[in-house]
Regions:
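C-terminal structured "cap/appendage" subdomains that terminate the fold
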Residues: 63-117
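An acidic, gly/pro-interrupted, aromatic-rich
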Residues: 1-74, 109-130
Length: 130
């Protein structure tokens, strides 16, 4: 199910569409370094492509089960897992507000956590290697 991210079918004439959005080089020549880019199209791919959406749901599901009583602990776990640092209190409160809003919209608990995980995975800090 999650192998799509590992095993992507490449053609020399037309690369995978998601790879084009992330500025993957053509396979016609070897490139030592990739360019660092961050475009709105990349965010659109990360929000809508099943290749990114399904892992976000799985991450949200794990974070939800970290501590069912205190969602802030689940958010902190997810933050450490994705960004390798502790979240600030402002970051935790924003994600708690997002969880509350998503629950009020009528989404289930699992879907609300999936949206929160998607937000973390779409952060520039997660996408861009520095």
């Amino acid at each position: 199910r999650f192998r799509r991210a590992l095993y992507t079918f490449w053609r020399r004439t037309s690369p995978h569409p998601a790879m084009l959005m992330f500025d993957a080089q053509s396979r016609e020549a070897c490139v030592l370094r990739r360019r660092r880019t961050n475009t709105p199209l990349q965010a659109l791919v990360m929000w809508n492509d099943p290749q990114f959406h399904e892992p976000a749901l799985a991450l949200g599901r794990h974070a939800m089960h970290v501590d069912a009583v205190a969602p802030a602990r689940g958010i902190a776990w997810m933050w450490r897992k994705c960004l390798l640092r502790e979240p600030t209190t402002a970051e935790v409160s924003r994600l708690l507000d997002l969880l509350k809003d998503e629950r009020e919209r009528g989404l289930g608990e699992e879907a609300a956590w999936g949206v929160a995980a998607s937000v973390v995975m779409c952060l520039d800090e997660f996408v861009t290697k520095r």
